[in-house]
Structure formats: C-alpha cells, structure tokens
UniProtKB/Swiss-Prot annotation:
Source organism (scientific name): Paracidovorax citrulli (strain AAC00-1) (Acidovorax citrulli)
Lineage of producing organism: Bacteria, Pseudomonadati, Pseudomonadota, Betaproteobacteria, Burkholderiales
Protein name per UniProt: Urease accessory protein UreD
Keyword terms: Chaperone, Cytoplasm, Nickel insertion
UniProt KW Membrane keyword: no
A GO cellular component annotation in the UniProt record: cytoplasm
Family: Belongs to the UreD family.
Function (record text): Required for maturation of urease via the functional incorporation of the urease nickel metallocenter.
Length: 276
C-alpha cells in the first residue's frame, strides 16, 4: 500500500501574534504551535507518523506565510527514503511568502537507504520584502551502522523560480561521483543552508551575510569541505560535505544562528525538539 499525503500550512498575522492553521489529508500533521520567542514567531513541528517513504509514496507539503507573519518549521527526525522495487518515492515542498513575511524551514535530514529510488523537491516563492532561511541535508546510507548506500538513486531539487535552481541525481553506482575528488570524495552527507530574499539584497547586507557565514566556517572543524557563496543577488548559500550528518548539521545551525543575529536582529533560539 502506498500513501499520497498532503499538508497545507498557513501562517497569518493576528495583531502582534503569528498564528498557524493547517489542513491535512493522510499521515501528515503539525503539532501544537509554540512561542518560545514571544507571539511574533510561531514554532511548529511537522510530523509524518509512518516515519518514512517507500516506492510509490508521495508527500505534498504546501506552506504560505502572510504579510508580517513569521513561521519556523522543523521535524522530529529524519525523512527516511526506504528501498524501492519500482516506483520512486517523492516529497514535494512548496513555500510561498507574501511581502514582509519570514519563514525558517529547518527539517532534519533526508536519509537515503540503499536501493531507494527517490526525489526530494523544495520550491520557495518569495514576494518583494519577504525573506527565508532554509536548509537541505542529505545522508546517504548509515555508514556507522554498516548500511552503506550501495545501490539506488536520489534526486535533489531546490528552486527559487526565476532566480536559482539546483538539481542533481546521486546514483550509488557512480563511483566518480561518490568517491572521486571532484565529487563527494567519500563523504556521505551533503548539506546546504540558504538565505533567500524576495528582492535583491543591498550590497552591504549581502556582504554581511557572507562574512557571518565565513566566520562560522573558519571556526569549524569542517572548514576544508565547506564554503559560502552568493549565486544570485537574492541568494546566499553555505554548502558542506561531511562523513556523517552530525558535524554538518552543527555547522548549518551555527550559520543559521549567525544569519538570524546579523540579518534579522534575532537571537538563535533553537526549537525545543532539537534538545530531545
């Protein structure tokens, strides 16, 4: 049996408070809204009770953020793509931000088991004045548990329509990609965190984002396999390769915190579930 689950998450501003509403079809839920930073920023945890996707499963997640609203979304665990005997598994996430909206999209990693056939797609559409911090983390197999990513294909798609597109397929059988010096060089976690604006960032703000990210990288143990770039005047990206998820995620959280502080004047208040 396969699933096609859908979730519509909507953030809106009610006075000084950001309020979340949602509709769902199938096994996708949003847990109770939390306000550890006060009413202006609404924290939510997205849960998928089955715990993973098999061939033929589809998860469709749509999020909208209304003017002046600020939402933060994370997950309690990895999105697991299990082995497939035919049809691919697909997760599609579409976030749409109105003018003056902010969104922090911070799920835990996508975990690709050997023999999976899967695609993970993220699309961010921002109106002028909207801003978003999001990340994407992919783990290939469970190397410390003796479960390598030996076979299978995983496609990763990240898009800001008309602004920025990254799409690539990781084939476990491609030795040059998996282990070559110009590929993953034996690393089994690839991750990126990106700051996206709905209009071109002023030069000073863009440079501040790059400087803050590079300071984090220079102080981190993964500095040899990480870097910060700005592929478009509306986008700043930090990328990193790591042997496993944990050090890469630590670097991304530090970069997220630095951008929060330098670009939004907010302290890096981590979601409570990250401490569990």
């Amino acid at each position: 049996m396969t699933w096609h689950a859908r979730l519509q998450l909507d953030y809106r501003r009610e006075g000084p408070r950001t309020v979340a509403g949602f509709l769902h079809d199938g096994p996708l839920r949003i847990l109770q809204s939390l306000y550890p930073e006060g009413g202006g920023i609404c924290h939510n945890v997205l849960v998928h009770p089955p715990g993973g996707l098999v061939g033929g499963d589809t998860l469709d997640i749509a999020a909208t953020v209304a003017p002046g609203a600020h939402g933060l979304v994370t997950t309690p665990g990895a999105t697991r793509f299990y082995r497939s005997t035919g049809a691919p598994a697909l997760q599609r996430t579409q976030a749409t931000l109105a003018a003056g909206a902010r969104l922090e999209w911070l799920p835990l990693e996508a975990l690709c088991y050997s023999a999976c056939q899967a695609e993970n797609r993220l699309t961010l559409s921002l109106s002028p004045g909207a801003e978003c911090i999001a990340w994407d983390v992919t783990a290939l197999g469970l190397p410390h548990s003796g479960q390598p990513f030996a076979t299978g294909r995983f496609t990763q798609h990240i898009e800001v329509p008309g602004i920025w597109l990254e799409r690539g397929t990781i084939d476990a059988a491609d030795g040059l990609l998996m282990d070559g010096r110009l590929g993953l060089a034996g690393h089994r976690c690839l991750a990126s965190v990106f700051f996206v604006a709905g209009e071109a960032l002023p030069r000073e703000r863009r440079e501040a984002a790059l400087d803050a990210a590079r300071a984090v990288i220079d102080a981190h143990a993964l500095r040899e396999t990480a870097g910060a770039t700005s592929p478009h005047p509306q986008v700043v990206v930090v990328r990193v390769l790591a042997p496993v998820v944990e050090p890469a995620m630590e670097l991304l959280r530090r970069a997220w915190g630095a951008w929060r502080e330098h670009l939004w004047g907010l302290q890096p208040r981590q979601p409570r579930i990250w401490a569990m």
